[in-house]
């Protein structure tokens, strides 16, 4: 895909090069001339409107500036046979609302459409696009961007806090503005020790309950929280607090509300022509035609828009399986095989490889993450090596297995020991992120703490055990908001988190303190992130003690000089005189203990040094004897 930068001082005309590469599917900055842009003609200032509608008979721009009347002078002119339309309209100003009246050439039926490339939209339930050209912002994150360009994410700490802006916090029973969020979120995330935030989708969507995953305005930011400048300020503040920003992005499908992309020119335009490929029954949406050049430009330019205009550091691509498979969530007879007779969506595969190739070439240091739940191979393998080119993949298998395990009565865990160990069999096949996301704490699945077995004490202990086991397991980390203080109710997108419980109950304060200390421990210990994807970074001590439901393993840094010994006890029993092999001779000290009293634990700590003895154990020449606290993770390290 050619790196075409069409930025001009005057958008009165659209360059031939822009037109050519747009229709060829090779333009990655289409947002610079598509949509509504400042222009002037014959010394008169106004706005040039441009859209793509190949099967339109006519398109008229209506809005505040002409009292929403269809007028001849505001009809677009078709400027290419392939369906580009454009018109200059004078005396249009920022903040004016507008729509396109699109008449189909075959049926003469007309529809009122929002601008697919609009930078701003009305707040739901209204659906008009809004002229937004005054978006200049003075950034202060040069230091961050310079560091990002040369970052080695695979060998750096990455501990992400996922959040839904509308329900993280509210103010006076209303949505907080981006500016208001910028005053509290960066400091909170920084103080808690996270390295990144991941925002659930920030593009415009009509239904709050869709959480942003059924968008209508891909270039329109979520108007519930304010304007473009406000969002830029929020990202800027996060960067100046040394926090990376990842955005959930939905390139596979779109909302079928009539003002949006569906049948944009009266026929299938952005979606596939074939209903078997276009209609996504499971989500009630339509799938993008990822083989159509202009649609590829729309989507890849959209990725570039978020990265360039808002300094986004990474895109987590939603529902990748829906892009890869023709038979995703479809029964036999509801899908048509590809030209080779298979179920692979060849156009979707090519799109993902092209997307990742473009971003890797043009956006140094920006990462892409695949939310993908199948066993499709080489998702995080570079494009030039035959892979899809993502930097990371969510480990849905680890999440499902371990959450199932941790919900079991400890009496029965020994029969399901493989659930807690199996992930290491395939861990090195991809660059995995261990994710406990929003999907796991909603729709009857229970909150994270409520997934834990037992009474109240054991639930808190189980949460501490599980999260410290997760920190020790190879792979980068992600946790959803509310889990860090042990919210018991499921996430509700229509109200803020129950922050009041932190003030009201010591158990929630202790849990919040635990997460803070655990995150700080993670960042401070190179053994926990330098070799996440290198075999030398992890070694089992004992993966087979199913009878006592105890795991032990070693994490090592790049040069092997820093090692951490993890002992995870998934039962409420304290084990005394427990023997484990260790890789080095010397004295060991406690580095972290999830059973600490300050976290609400029972206080079964190891206060003294533990000296190894030259006895063979678990394949090592040295052995230590320890007390293993109940329902807890104990971490030891060699004393310097």
Curated annotation (Swiss-Prot):
Is Glycosyltransferase tagged as a keyword? yes
* GO cellular component terms, semicolon-separated: cytosol
- The keyword Oxidoreductase is assigned to this record: no
Annotated keywords: Carbohydrate metabolism, Glycogen biosynthesis, Glycogen metabolism, Glycosyltransferase, Transferase
Instruction: Show the active-site residues.
Output: 318, 371
Q: Extract the GO molecular function terms from the UniProt entry.
A: 1,4-alpha-glucan branching enzyme activity; cation binding; hydrolase activity, hydrolyzing O-glycosyl compounds
Q: Which reaction does it catalyse?
A: Transfers a segment of a (1->4)-alpha-D-glucan chain to a primary hydroxy group in a similar glucan chain
Q: What class of enzyme is it?
A: transferase
Q: What is its EC number?
A: 2.4.1.18
InterPro entries, per database record? A-amylase/branching_C, Branching_enzy, GlgB, GlgB_N_E_set_prok, Glyco_hydro_13_cat_dom, Glyco_hydro_13_N, Glyco_hydro_b, Glycoside_hydrolase_SF
Q: Which cysteines are joined by disulfide bonds?
A: none
Per UniProt, subunit arrangement is:
Monomer.
* Job of this protein: Catalyzes the formation of the alpha-1,6-glucosidic linkages in glycogen by scission of a 1,4-alpha-linked oligosaccharide from growing alpha-1,4-glucan chains and the subsequent attachment of the oligosaccharide to the alpha-1,6 position.
> What family is reported?
Belongs to the glycosyl hydrolase 13 family. GlgB subfamily.
Its recorded name reads: 1,4-alpha-glucan branching enzyme GlgB
Protein species of origin: Francisella philomiragia subsp. philomiragia (strain ATCC 25017 / CCUG 19701 / FSC 153 / O#319-036)
Q: What is the phylogenetic placement of the source species in the record?
A: Bacteria, Pseudomonadati, Pseudomonadota, Gammaproteobacteria, Thiotrichales
